[in-house]
Amino acid sequence: MSDFKATVSETMSASGHSGFHVTGYEKIEYGFTLIDRIFHPSNTNLADCYKKWGRCLAVTDQNIYNVYGKQMEAYFQHHGLGLKIHKTKIGEKVKTMPTLLSIVDSMNEFGLYRKEPVLVIGGGLVTDVAGFACAAYKRNTNFIRIPTTVIGLIDASVSIKVAVNYGNYKNRLGAYHAPMHTFLDFTFLRTLSTAQIRNGFAELIKISTCSHLDTFNLLDKYCEQLIEQSFGRANGSSQELIDAADKINREGIHEMLRLETPNLHEIGLDRVIAYGHTWSPLHELVPETPLRHGHAISIDMAYSATLANNRKLISDEEHRRLLNLFSRAGLSMDHHQFDEDVLSKATTAILKTRDGLLRAAVPNPIGSCTFLNDVSAEEMNVALRRHKELMKEYPRNGEGIEAYVDASDTGYTENSQAEEERMVGATAKKAGSLNGTSGKIQSANGTGAVKNTNSMNDHHTNKNKTHANGVLRKGSVTEKEVNGNGHAHFVEPAKA
C-alpha cells in the first residue's frame, strides 16, 4: 500500500512565464509473514484481512486450485467469509494482456470496493499478471500475495514489479504496485515438482553469489538434498536440512529486501540482483520451446562467471566452484543456440534497458559484486568461446535437466486449442461484441494466425512427471501426481 504527500509552489521561468512546481513523496508500506499451512482453520492471519469485507475474490492457477482448492474453500467457510475464485491458466506464453483482462472481468463482476484487496495465490507468473491487473483496475486496487513456488517465495514476492509479456519481450508492459501483505508459506513446496524446485534454486544462487557468502556456502553444502527434499519440506527430511533450508530461505528473502527496497522503482540501474539478467532475457525465448527462467539466468550467470574469471575478478578455484554448483543442481550453463549472434543481439537489447550502459553484475569475489561497463564485443566473444570449451568437461555439455518449459510454464491445451489462442479469441470476441465487428482473432503480426507454441506437453495436466533418474519423487506423505503447474495431488501408492 502507499500514500502520497506533495507540496505545490508557484514558479516563474527565466523567460517570465508563470507556472507551478509539484514536489511529492510516496510512502510505501507492505509486510511479510512467514507462516506454515496458511489455509489451516486455526491460522486466522489471512481471514483477519478479509473480516472487514466479509468476502474475498481470489485469483489462482487452475492446477493450484486442483491441489488446494478444497482447503481454500473450507478455510473461508470456517471463518464465515464468502469466497469467489477466478481460476486462470497462466504460463509464459499466456502471460499476456488477454489473460490480464480475463482477471479484470472477474474483478468487475465481483464489484470490488475501492480498497478491498484481491487475494493472489500462485507462482511468480500468477502474481505478476494478477498484480498488474490490480495496478490497472481503477488505477490502484489492493492485493494480498501468497506465492507457491520457490521463485515466487524467494524472488517475485520481494519485488513490487508486476507485468505481462508483449510479443517476444518479457515483462515489457507493467507497473510498480506493492501488495498490502505477503504470506510466505514454504509448505507449498511439498507439492512442487523437482523441476520447479531446481528452477527456483537458480534464484538463490543469484542472490548469494553476488551478495551473501554464508548463504552460498549453505547452498553448496546441501545442494542435492535441498532439491530432492523440497527444501526440507518433504517426508523424511533431517532436522539439519530443515534448519539449513529455513536459514537459506529467510536470509535469501532478507537479502533481496535489503538490496531492492532502497530502489523499488529501479531508478538506480546498477542492481546486484541483476546478476544473470544481462543476456538471459533474450536467450530465454530463443529456443522454439523456451528455457525455464531459472535455467536461462543460470546460463547467463555461468557465462558471466567465465567473463569475470578472464578478468581475474574471481579465482580459478571460485570459478570452478560456481560452475560445479550449477552442474550439481542440474541447472543449465550453456545452450547450443547461445552463440555470438545471440550474445550481440542480447547486448544491444539490454543497453537500451539500462540507459546505454551494460551494467553487467559479476562476482568479485563470490559473495560480493562489481558492475562491468567496458566489455568489448571481442572480449565477450573470447569469453564465450572459452566458456563453450569448458562446458565440454561437464555432463550434457553444460545443458540442464528439465531445462525447457512445459505445460506448467507455457499455458495449457484443451480440446486441441492452446490456452493462448483461447484467451486471445475470447478477448477478440468480447471486443467484437462491443464494437459490432466479428471479433476475428488477430495474432501479434496481424495475420490472424495464432501459433500453438505449447509443443512439449499437450494435455499435460494430471500426468505424472519423473525426475532425471526416471523415478517419481517421494512426497511429504505419499507419492505425488504432478499437475501442469509443477504442483501435485497426493495419491495413495498402489498396494502390493
List the model feature ranges, each with a label:
Residues 222, 227-341:
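Active-site segments that bind and position negatively charged phosphate/pyrophosphate groups
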